[in-house]
């Protein structure tokens, strides 16, 4: 979308002039490439569930004027399962829950943290309150969190005193259902001392400083900060000409401040697509600008489809050359709470799932002493964030007792699927045995996908599905 709009609307179809004006003079051109005939564009898409980054090299051929073709080459891509939903959870845990807990303590409840844990924590089991806990998150905490983020997004970044001062009731456009209110009120009334005043949930005060939120983002106290640090480091390494930022969380002042602070490219080369001016050709434009950030994906796909049929006048783009690749290069055991894959925990190196007929080294096997989460990273750098992929758990009581003693479980993985023309589809458990050579039956182990990035809770459910938002 950005490439087409710049070339056609701002440069009148003169793609050569467009490339020459934006190419960085401080980056040496590739061998055999004339200066000003290539652009290196990075994009960061911060969505609700994932943060995705791609660095693409755009090269002009030997044509001139309107008769020139753009050939893209994907240099690097990465994606992390940390994005807007995690920022919402951070806001709930940093501001909403402490405000409620403080008000409970002021009302006379001595052990407010225990009450909060029983109402909103992770019980580790499916109990009768599971549905009510989830509905509380959906009807109470998430709307308040969204209201805080919306106020932050529209705030004056130059006002050091900007903030949100309201009550829970002020921020709720729709009150929770009677069942949810009864669930909360009964538990609170039971914990209140005898003779206490009625606790009004909608009167809980909430005070949020937007400057403090920005400082927390810059200090890395938001979950989203870690993947942004990683992708900005990669973008800086590639000396990109332009950085495009899209996605609703990218509109937050704290996210914008962090990216400007990291400065993967000079600030004047960062394009925020939420404020990007488009012309009448853009089908979803709102007052000359991109309204819905999600629309850029649909319009970009439309442009690629039209380019394949040569139906874009004055814009020749070789869309067929854009292809993704697997980012699974190093697979191993993740740390318990943070998504880090240390070098000593890497099981398999230099995996290539795009290679037809790829196989894992059958000689390799690995010792286990309990349930583990397997994850992967793309780079040979232990600092690079890893992504959870599988959980390997023991579901046999006899096997668990053997391992709890002096036993060590050895496991071996293999790749499933794939042909001479296509790469493999997934990993699976090949075989397992104890250190004395006793084979372990397949039904004693469970090897399943688990791509949840947030492992701060002991449960295996996503926080929006479980409603478990309180951390002890």
Roles of regions detected by a PLM:
Residues 35-52, 56-59, 84-85, 247-250:
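A short acidic Gly-Thr/Ser loop motif
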Residues 1-13, 85, 89-90, 271-329:
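Glycine-rich phosphate-binding/hydrolytic loop that grips phosphoryl groups
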Residues 251-271:
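Conserved helicase motor "Helicase C" RecA-like lobe of SF1/SF2 P-loop NTPases
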Residues 55-197, 310-392:
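Phosphate-binding glycine-rich/basic clefts of nucleotide- and phosphate-handling proteins
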Residues 17-35, 39-40, 45-48, 106-119, ...:
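Extended, charge-rich low-complexity interaction segments
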Residues 1-41, 449-472:
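Nucleotide/phosphate-binding catalytic cleft detector across ATP-hydrolyzing
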Residues 345-472:
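Long C-terminal appendages of very large multidomain proteins
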Residues 3-34, 187-239, 255-258:
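Phosphate/ATP-binding catalytic cores across multiple sugar-kinase/actin-like superfamilies
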């Amino acid at each position: 979308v950005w490439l087409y709009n710049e070339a056609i609307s701002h440069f009148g179809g003169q793609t050569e002039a467009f490339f020459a004006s934006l190419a960085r003079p401080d980056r040496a051109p590739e061998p055999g490439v004339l200066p000003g005939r290539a652009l290196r564009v990075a994009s960061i898409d911060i969505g609700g569930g994932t943060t995705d980054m791609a660095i693409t090299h755009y090269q002009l051929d030997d044509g001139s004027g309107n008769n020139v073709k753009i050939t893209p080459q994907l240099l690097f891509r990465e994606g992390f399962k940390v994005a807007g939903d995690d920022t919402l959870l951070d806001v709930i845990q940093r501001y909403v829950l402490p405000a409620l807990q403080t008000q409970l303590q002021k009302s006379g409840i001595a052990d407010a943290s225990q009450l909060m844990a029983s109402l909103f924590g992770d019980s580790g089991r499916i109990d009768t309150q599971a549905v009510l806990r989830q509905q509380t998150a959906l009807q109470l905490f998430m709307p308040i969190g969204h209201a805080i983020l919306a106020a932050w997004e529209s705030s004056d970044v130059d006002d050091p005193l900007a903030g949100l001062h309201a009550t829970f009731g002020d921020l709720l456009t729709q009150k929770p259902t009677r069942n949810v209110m009864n669930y909360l009120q009964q538990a609170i009334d039971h914990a209140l001392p005898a003779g206490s005043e009625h606790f009004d949930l909608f009167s809980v005060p909430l005070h949020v400083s937007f400057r403090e939120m920005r400082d927390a983002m810059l200090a890395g106290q938001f979950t989203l900060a870690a993947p942004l640090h990683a992708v900005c480091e990669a973008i800086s390494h590639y000396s990109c000409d332009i950085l495009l930022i899209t996605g609703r969380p990218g509109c937050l002042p704290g996210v914008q401040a962090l990216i400007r602070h990291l400065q993967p490219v000079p600030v004047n080369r960062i394009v925020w697509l939420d404020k990007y001016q488009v012309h009448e050709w853009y089908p979803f434009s709102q007052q000359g600008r991109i309204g819905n950030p999600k629309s850029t994906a649909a319009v970009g796909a439309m442009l690629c489809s039209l380019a394949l049929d040569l139906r874009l006048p004055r814009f020749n783009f070789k869309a067929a050359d854009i292809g993704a690749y697997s980012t699974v290069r190093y697979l191993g055991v993740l740390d318990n709470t943070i998504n880090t894959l240390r070098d000593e925990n890497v099981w398999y190196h230099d995996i290539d799932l795009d290679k037809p007929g790829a196989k894992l080294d059958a000689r390799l096997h690995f010792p286990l002493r309990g349930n583990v989460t397997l994850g992967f990273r793309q780079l040979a750098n232990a600092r690079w964030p890893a992504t959870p992929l599988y959980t390997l758990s023991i579901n046999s009581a006899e096997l668990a007792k053997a391992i709890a003693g002096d036993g060590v479980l050895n496991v071996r993985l293999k790749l499933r699927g794939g042909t001479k023309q296509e790469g493999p589809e997934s990993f699976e458990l090949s075989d397992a045995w104890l250190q004395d050579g006793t084979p372990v039956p397949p039904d004693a182990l469970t090897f399943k996908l688990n791509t949840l990035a947030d492992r701060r809770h002991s449960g295996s459910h996503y926080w929006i599905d479980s409603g478990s938002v309180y951390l002890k």
